[in-house]
Amino acid sequence: SLVGSEMCIRDRLSQTEKDMVDMVCDNFDDVIVIYNGANQFELGFTDEYPQIKSVVWCPGTGNVGFNALGKVFSGEVNPSGKTPDTFIYDMTTAPWWNNGEKIEYTNLADMAVEGMNAGSPQVYAPAFTNYVEGIYVGYKYYETAAQEGFIDYDKTVQYPFGYGLSYTEFEQKMGELEEKDGQISVDVEVTNTGDVAGKDVVEVYYNPPYTNGGIEKASANLIEFAKTDLLQPGDSQTVTVTFDVEDMASYDENDAEAYVLEKGDYVISINRDSHTVLDQKTYTVDDTVVYAGENKRASDDTAAVNVFEDAKGDITYLSRADHFANYEEATAAPASAELGEPYVSEYHLNSNFDKTTYLNDEDVMPTTGADNGLTLADMRDADYDDPRWEKLLDQLTVDEMANMIAMAGYQTAAMDSVGKVATLDFDGPAAINNNFTGVGSIGFPIEVVIASTWNKELAQTWGECMGKISQEMGAEGWYAPGMNTHRTAFGARNYEYFSEDGVLAGNMGANAVEGARKYGVYSYIKHFALYEGLSLIHISEPTR
């Protein structure tokens, strides 16, 4: 068992643990290693001992989840999980290794402030983290780097993304691609060819056409997945997987500043994991499509554009161009921790906010306290651009607006002017807890366990459980699911997030939200980006 906390996360065995493994393997011929940690771990040592016959990854299972472990060992339960992250042999070879934590600016030490962290005083200074790897997070880097001949995959990756063993064997047969109304469908016949009942996962990936030096694209991209029913030996099930063509578009931050579906051949494959292709078909895009302006993707409310340009910084980002030729430069530790102009001046200006500098005699006080006869309930399902929103906002009083912000922790304040009642919001992703009364629910498996099932229906059931418990405890809001990406193996909150992959995480999270919603509970998909640990919370706060 890996001992750790938000302040202490390790990626390899301690000497004490090495000694324990030596002792066990010296005394037993058949050894099973159980890894009880939420983050990826260097498990290469298991290859060095012939006595170690298998490895079971069993992260936080909640109050009673560990009861199933014995059933797995006895064969009563056939495991069917898949890894939601990539396990590599050596963390120091990861592209994020030199840029995994915050670095304090050397010329902004005077802007440090005192605060609290986990109940202890702490000084917070302005800091930064360079996300130098760009889109090449997790398997998207390792699979692409292998295709480019940049890494020796077998010496780098121990367990690929989407990998997991079973007590039985499965065969998957891929049907023809069918396109209709901008969607691609493919039937996959899954057959249990072994001797034990079990479930399998259909993983569908795409490999887009890539132009050297062009839009950054990974060679392997999960686009959809499905879990089979429990199949008896010899039984088959046909799983139909459907996805939108536009979902294969790549974001062009340099030229189009929009999503672009470039013309060319897109290889659609069914995989055993991110690295093992079982079968593949080709889908051809005849003409390039730019999703900009009014021609937005159907899945977008507004067309995606570049934002936070000022945060890009003067650094080199990892590129696939010329077989990752800039890898050493891009992934090096920052050469300087000094913030340049005009950002230093802006930081000091914003930190010494003076509201009087924004006063303008021509400004008009917004309407407040109007009697327009609207209630918040009237706006249910209203469009964002519905003109009634302005009339509703005109009804609010200044005191109500101030109170709404000041009383926004684990609750929302009442607003009588629009008929809004006060609500309670409880934390968190693995249990429902009332921070004020101490009342809480049982612990559920952590999100990384939910993601490892690759089972959308189970994720929805999990959300339903959280919704029902919240309802019974009198809560209307759920501070979950956590939706950040497993960017590094040292993420202090990785246990609260699903995966290194957005498609897997997004599907699991969406189903959980839908499940909670059945009980009238709304969800806060918290920590959406940038929050890898408590030391980074004040960096991420403005954009969360």
Residue ranges with predicted function:
Residues 1, 5-253, 260-270, 274, ...:
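Glycoside hydrolase catalytic-domain context in secreted enzymes
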Residues 276-294:
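Short beta-strand elements
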